[in-house]
Amino acid sequence: MRLTTPLGLVTRAILAAAISGLVLAGSLAIVAVIAVAGGMILSAYGSDLLGFVQITPPRMFWPIVWSLCALGATSLFVRAIVRIIRTERAAFLERTTPLSEVAMAETSYIDSSAERLARQVGIATPTVRIDSTTTPLAYTTYRPDAPIVSADRDETPIIVLSTGLIKTLSQSELSAVLAHEIGHIANDDLRLITVLLVPLIAAETLTEDEGSTSNVFELCGHLLSFIALIGVGVFSRGRELAADRAAAVMSGEPAALASALEKLDESTTPKPTTDLRDHARSMNAINVLPTLGPVATGTGLLSTHPSLETRLEQLRSLTRD
C-alpha cells in the first residue's frame, strides 16, 4: 500500500534515477577503460612473444582479448559492490539484538505498535532489533543475505531502534518514529534508495583514500561520488517528507512526531561517530534523522534530509488540518 504518490515525488525519482544511472555508467566505463588499457599493454608483450614463435593471430584476436578484459573487470567490479553492501549491512546488524531478547519495559509496546502500524498499511510486520548505543537512532535496512536490488516486495525489512532513542522518547513519540520507518517501507523507499546507492558505492570504490586525487581515475571517482550524492539527496529529501506525512496519518498525532524530531535533534551530536560515518552511505537516507551531521540537512545539493524547520512546518500544517 503506497501512502503517497504525488507528482513531485515521481519527478524527483526520475531525476535521481537519471543522475544515478549516469554515475553508474561512468564508473563502469572507467573500470572498462582501465581493463582495456591493461589488456593493450598485455597484448604488446603477447604480440612480441607470438612473433618470436612465428604465430600470427587473426586480426580480431586482440580486440576480442581487450573486450574480455573489460567484461571480466566490470563483472568483478559489480561483485565487489555487492560484497561491500552486504558487509555494511552485516556490520550494522551484528551489534543489534532481537527485540524479543531485550529486557526493557518498552519491549511489549514497541512490538504491539509495529504490528498495529504495519497492519494499518497492509504490509508484513517488520522485524525490530535493538542497538545498545546511547546515540538516538532509528533506521531501516535489509538482511545481509537479502537481494541487493529486488523486483518484488517479498523481503521483510528490519527496523533498528537504539536504546538511546527509546530512552529519549515518550511512548507516543516512539510510536510516531516507528510509523515514520514503516511509512518508508510502505512507500517502497528502502528498495528504491538501495537502487540509488549502488552507483554511489560504485563511484566511491574507485577512490582508494578519502580526499585522494593521486590519478585521473580517482579524480573521476570523487567527481562521480559528488554527483551520485546529489541524486540520492534529490530523492531522499522528498521521501523523508513523505514518510513524515505517512507517520502523521498512521499515528493520528502529527504533534508526537514533531516533538520526537525536536528531541532527537537536540540530543544528536553535531559530529557523528566514526562507525556511523563509515556506513552512512548505506544507511543515512533511511534514518529518521541524518547521521552525517549538519551537511546532511537542509536544501543543499548533498542534503539527504530536509531541514528540521521544514519538517516541523509540514507537521504543524497537518495538525491544523
Where are these regions (language model features)?
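Short helix/loop segments within enzyme catalytic domains
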Residues: 105-123, 213-284
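Hydrophobic or amphipathic, alpha-helical segments that drive membrane association/targeting
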Residues: 1-131, 204-207, 221, 225, ...
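Active-site-proximal gating segments in proteases and membrane effectors
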Residues: 122-125, 129-151, 249-321
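DG-centered beta-turn motif at the end of beta-strands
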Residues: 180-181, 243, 307
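Residues at alpha-helix boundaries and short interhelical turns
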Residues: 169, 186-189, 234-237, 251, ...
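Peri-catalytic and regulatory segments of divalent metal-dependent proteins
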Residues: 80-194
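Loop-to-transmembrane-helix entry motif
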Residues: 17, 21, 181, 185-189, ...
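Post-HEXXH active-site segment of zinc metalloproteases
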Residues: 189-221, 264-265
